[in-house]
Amino acid sequence: MATTSNMFLYSLTIQPPTAVTQALLGQFSGTKEQQILTASGSRLTLLQPDPRQGKVNTLLSHDIFGIVRAIASFRLAGSHKDYIILATDSGRITIIEYLPKTNKFQRIHLETFGKSGVRRVIPGQYLAADPKGRACLISALEKNKLVYVLNRNSQAELTISSPLEAHKPGVLVLSLVALDVGYANPVFAALELDYTDADQDPTGQAREEVETQLVYYELDLGLNHVVRKWSDTVDRTSSLLFQVPGGNDGPSGVLVCGEENVTYRHSNQEAFRVPIPRRSGATEDPQRKRVIVSGVMHKLKGSAGAFFFLLQTDDGDLFKVTIDMIEDSDGNPTGEVKRLKIKYFDTIPVATSLCILKSGFLFAASEFGNHHFYQFEKLGDDDEELEFSSDDFPTDPTASYNPVYFHPRPLENLVLVESIDSMNPQVDCKVANLTGEDAPQIYSVCGNGARSTFRMLKHGLEVSEIVASELPGTPSAVWTTKLTKYDQYDAYIVLSFTNGTLVLSIGETVEEVSDSGFLTTAPTLAVQQMGEDGLIQVHPKGIRHIVQGRVNEWPAPQHRSIVAATANENQVVIALSSGEIVYFEMDSDGSLAEYDEKKEMSGTVTSLSVGQVPEGLKRSSFLAVGCDDCTVRILSLDPDSTLEMKSIQALTAAPSALSIMSMEDSFGGSTLYLHIGLHSGVYLRTVLDEVTGELTDTRQKFLGPKPTRLFQVSVQDQPCVLALSSRPWLGYTDPLTKGFMMTPLSYTELEYGWNFSSEQCLEGMVGIHANYLRIFSIEKLGDNMIQKSIPLTYTPKHLVKHPEQPYFYTIESDNNTLPPELRAKLLEQQSNGDATVLPPEDFGYPRAKGRWASCISIIDPISEEPRVLQRIDLDNNEAAVSAAIVPFASQEGESFLVVGTGKDMVLDPRQFTEGYIHVYRFHEDGRDLEFIHKTRVEEPPLALIPFQGRLLAGVGKTLRIYDLGLKQLLRKAQADVTPTLIVSLQSQGNRIIVGDLQQGITYVVYKAEGNRLIPFADDTLNRWTTCTTMVDYESVAGGDKFGNIYIVRCPERVSQETDEPGSEIHLMHARNYLHGTPNRLSLQVHFYTQDLPTSICKTSLVVGGQDVLLWSGLQGTVGVFIPFVSREDVDFFQNLENHMRAEDPPLAGRDHLIYRGYYTPVKGVIDGDLCERFSLLPNDKKQMIAGELDRSVREIERKISDIRTRSAF
């Protein structure tokens, strides 16, 4: 198979995966502050909790281009810094450290031990580090374990030994932890299951007798050897281990968690066992047993032996587990265990990892939905919850006991302080512009159970509005100003109207100021605080300089007026209507001195800008002048060459605004930029050489149809540019990548803006629109995707949009869940008064084996309060599996909602009683649904689409066409077209694209004259299809269950033959090839994304941008594939990608090319995520790559930036 292609795409991630597989706590920066490290897909993210504000901020996000299997942290004795161990699919163990100065991860060690990939005998699935940082054990799922000794050399550098083997064939590992043994030889505990006898016994008897064993592995540091120190049989259902503190802090050992029990075990201690309490309630199954799925141990400061565990069940209930120790005569714990105790603590969503911070917070990385950051109110010591002790229960796991129960309740010990957006699992996604804005929005359904959500994603920065005040007139401009150079906050808001100026004071209340010294009878062009305590007001007829109540006026020359002005703390420049530039500078005595000569421009001046005075200097060296002849000129302001022209740049339209600013760049310093706004709505950013005044490296972006105005503002202590067109934008340096970003604000249109600072709002902005004054602030610069969510009832399965109205329809279903009618019956039957109904979004729905809860929801996403308009519950134990909106030609083109369901479904192995197709009629423009009828089919129909005024349904492996009848759907045509199961359908004209569960894509043609469905081409690979979309008439893009996205194309000759009239007989009798169709599809594009694609569509994301392929992934990823237009760009980015592979190899040692071609060699796709790491390289590597590519560094960065901004976010 050729790996070259005539189609090339550029892959970019818009939203990285948000499903956290593991999170751990550590002092990674070497200070006392704790950070949280999370692994999400191929990304490592370092989070910084802020206890004062109760927020979690992202410090660093790094794509390692590999699958993170496990992470662990350790600290060498005497050190204050935690190191990170990575176990990935690279077949190597990696040790990295976080460098806070450069905000990067640095690899310290990379040791190869096995093959790459995720294999059951290659270590990496489990990882444990000794609490004293002396060794780590990395284990495979089966057979192989390796121990590495960690130490430091004479230069105090971290060293790692050769691996020590602890292999045993025929053994499966279920869980692994390191024991806390103080400074004795390191010991690791593993839950193991020996299947040797069961593997060789054909009767299955040995399988029933398999035992789960707790095994201790000891590393003898003296002999440098690993021995199997101790093993004992534990409860057969055991699946999870937790480390118990040792040394001076506790008895050491482990907690072994199995089905409905937690047992303390250690080699030199008795076993102690407590049951996991069951929920009591009218709708709860009293026989259902719970298992522990996650937990955390926390040591309390101040006293030895003070620690507790928080263990979480699969319901989300947290239980506090404590260990009582026998005390000596002085009342000190001896290290010998007396009893184990468990009590209900609180209920939170099920988490993959729990982290307790020293500052009294709990971070819960949720398995599904948003992650949560809680604060401890209390530790649950003095509440009235029942506590169960090991004294009352047998240690023998086979012995009978009476189950214990508890009543779940709302949070008492924890309080939620922040919820971190996560779209995992993301089930379906659509792109539409429902709000009438410039760019479309992404609408997605995600989540699980009662915590499922419908989400609206919009490109932009979140804005917090502080004040929106109506004004007596319509102002044209607004400024804020301090009174003196040393003031911390602004004192005045100055508003310019067509016939005057209004000055307002900033304080507890905003009041008009009458003695400010400003001229209030004329409009204002500029306001600036100058010198120590002076104020400048520029108005059309002159300049007013106000110093300590004294007013000095500079009048404009006769018959001329001022048309533009700019100023900083030492300089003022004005432009007269005659085209002359007049320059003023502040004298040492605080007065304004006019430069003798005036500079005459060739056209009318439309805008001016003088930059801020650099630190340590007296003046800004350059003045930018924009004229109506579509040029920008740079004039010098140096004393030796005042108002001399340094450079000129031609523009495509007249400039409407200019701003000279110094901003941080990706080179590790700052660069002087000239920002240009044009009358055409285009924004330009160009580099202004600080020595010569030359303009280079121009980048542009279309912001909207209105003229662009620019204002320098400050956000998070960094200079930014506020650009106002048909909507407001903010240009800033990305905190993580240091690349320049131009992002829209999620806010109303503004006509003018300025910085704003007061006691209540330290760093905000003031803006005007029509007759409203608005004060607002921007909290976060890192996240440029705004999410709004609407809660759903059950796990969503599919999302469809009304063809004409702004409404969405979701089908939702949950397995093993009590449906509403059964819940109501059980509550009615409850006689003892215990009929409390807890909110399902916090506690989940009651479970019931074999039962389905399912519904159809109508969603209005754009009303003032986005909400679910109607919900239709399905009964008869049916679960909705597919949906489509179909216009039936027999009903004069009226559209109906068609929903496919399955009855009594079992997912594994696949079973069902029968399937149905429900038909609903729309009322009130789609706001209401009326049930028409349902049609029985043999299997649940997993795919439905409209087709030529009828319904096309995939029922099992049969493709059917239905028309609408009075009492049920009428079958019109059918054919068996795939070998396994139809899961997706697309159509264009007479061509139908069928996606099979296991066998990839099949092209089918519908011949109306014979009413036949004929498959004529299929794929060369057996792909496990999840989603498909037609790119054009011949090409189809799809995703599979293993994380691949591909494009296949039908050969042109075959495509033409199938569409010819009279080709039906030829197609029906064509000879099948290798048990498939007569023809094969050719592979054009193939790329491994590492997230399971759940939807893919062809759409445009930006104004005037080209069509892209947007895909969504199960773990919350949103990505795009951008087609290249020119071969020159393809060659450039291919060369850049090759250089990046060599100069910036993946952190964990995975080969990038092999990673992106995990199952099939990568074809026709360039990895944009890798190319975008160019800006993070050291300057010497950037220069080296630029030299190899025969380009400048800025040119490479511009091309990387342009390809994203022109087609994506």
Curated annotation (Swiss-Prot):
It comes from the Eukaryota. It is found in: Nucleus. One of its GO terms (biological process) is mRNA splicing, via spliceosome. GO terms for molecular function: U2 snRNA binding. GO terms for cellular component: nucleus; spliceosomal complex; U2 snRNP. Keywords: mRNA processing, mRNA splicing, Nucleus, Spliceosome. Involved in pre-mRNA splicing and cell cycle control. Belongs to the RSE1 family. Associated with the spliceosome. This is Pre-mRNA-splicing factor rse1. It comes from Neurospora crassa (strain ATCC 24698 / 74-OR23-1A / CBS 708.71 / DSM 1257 / FGSC 987). The lineage of its organism: Eukaryota, Fungi, Dikarya, Ascomycota, Pezizomycotina.
